[in-house]
Amino acid sequence: MKLLYIFSFIFFLSTQALAGQGDTTSYIQVVDVYSGKMDTILAFKGHVEAPNWHRDNYLIVNSYGKLYTIDLKSRKMTLLNTGTAQSCNNDHLISPDGKWLGISNTDANDTSTKLNKSIIYIMPINGGQPRRVTPSIPSYLHGWSPDGKTLIYCAERNGDYDVYAIPVEGGTEKRITTTEGLDDGPEYSADGKHIYFNSYRSGHMHIWRMLADGSQPEQLTFDENSNWFAHPSPNNQSIVYMAYTSDEKQQHLFGKDVKLRLMDLKTKKIRDLTPVFFGGQGTINVPSWSADSRKLAFVSYKVN
């Protein structure tokens, strides 16, 4: 939720209003990447976004600025205590050891964020008061290094959206990409050697990867879809990403025809993981693989 932020924020408010009237239904779903079988975990009357999958078999999702857990056995949705962070967006993720949660939130009491700009925080996985990490705004969290030491994120600095890195403890951020056009959704590979991301540098939104220091960028997709948010599997064998079936330029909108696609990282072959469905913003913004690399969580929608 970062490109054309003012537009996205207005749009978010409009979808919130719709959902408050019961017009939006969010379907939290799981797909098996081997069999293709899909299971609807929960149908929620309202807007839910961006599932993470914890190794203890529950999901973490966003809904209207708050975070919730969804137990995959009981399918119960429970509010997560995020302290003073009450305006979270859909860029959040779980630390490699499963003990911490990174979140992106707008602090209404912080005068530096009066334009509704996002800050990255870290908090205990079971809830608590978040600790601020990024000094500059806006910053949108997407990746956590396998050694647990570094966060990577999309950030707007001087009008350019690029990939940045910062120590988990905070400090000075490092710019990783410098090309024109949006670079978004950065995530580390399981071995920490690569960063996968989506970029408009070619004039079309595609999936790319680079070495962790930003060198040797490599384009991975070449079709006519608008391809967003590559999520490397824990076993480092594949990536899943979301494809808009139409050219959306640099926009990542809700309410579009999309599908999930799977790329084999050894052969670079790509196949559809799901049929086309109604989704987009909120569907799979953040990593949502199960620990065994067999399943993925995502959200599809219906607006009445």
Regions found by a protein language model. Give the residues of each.
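A detector of repeated loop/turn-to-beta-strand junctions in beta-rich toroidal repeat architectures
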Residues: 25-27, 117-119, 160-162, 204-206, ...
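Ankyrin-repeat and related helical/solenoid repeat scaffolds used for protein-protein interactions
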Residues: 218, 229-286
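Conserved beta-propeller blade repeats
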Residues: 45-60, 86-101, 136-154, 180-198, ...
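Asp-box/WD-like beta-propeller blade repeats and closely related beta-sheet repeat scaffolds
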Residues: 85-91, 95, 104-145
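Hydrophobic packing within well-folded, soluble alpha/beta domains
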Residues: 120, 142, 148-151, 163-168, ...
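Bacterial Sec-dependent N-terminal signal peptides
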Residues: 1-22
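Beta-strand C-termini and the immediately following turn/loop, strongest in propeller blades
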Residues: 20-22, 42, 54-65, 102-114, ...
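Multi-bladed beta-propeller domains
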Residues: 30-47, 72-88, 123-138, 167-182, ...
